[in-house]
Amino acid sequence: QNCGSRSPESLVATPYKGTKIGKIIGVVSGKGGVGKSMVTDLLAVSLAKKGYKVGILDADITGPSIPAAFGLTEKATSNDEVMFPVYSKELHIPVMSINLLLENESDPVIWRGPIIAGTVKQFYTEVAWGELDYLLVDMPPGTGDVALNVFQSLPVDGVIIVASPQDLVSMV
């Protein structure tokens, strides 16, 4: 059986057992440096303060910034079966990012697209997220392999597109 003979639904990943996620929201941008991660952080904090259970999957593997924004310095843990996210101190927001797995978080991640896409998928399928109302996926800039993989393999309910005014002005 190949991908062409499968239904689109069969390509969608399922979260780790015991994980229940209400809505998955991708936060995307056409280029870097427009504040996408800041929007993700602020939205997560705002939702958590309103009483929603929210988690953040940092899919920006080559430029992760979510852990630093929350002041997270401890590493994610795992057992033989599953990884566990690191929780923010004040609002208890679970976060999974490549920075939380690397021995030295300042080491560059120089991986090919399929490896990065596979890692992002693992952050969804092999992390014990628990019960969440929202999972925010902080996407890398652009529309490359990772974005395509996320939108094909995760049941994304919506997207937030972050753009700077300069980008919009140039299109007019």
What is each of the regions a protein language model found here?
Residues 21, 32, 58, 66, ...:
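Residue-level signature of catalytic and energy-coupling elements of molecular machines
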Residues 53-55, 59-105, 110, 117:
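Phosphate-binding loop that captures ATP/GTP phosphates
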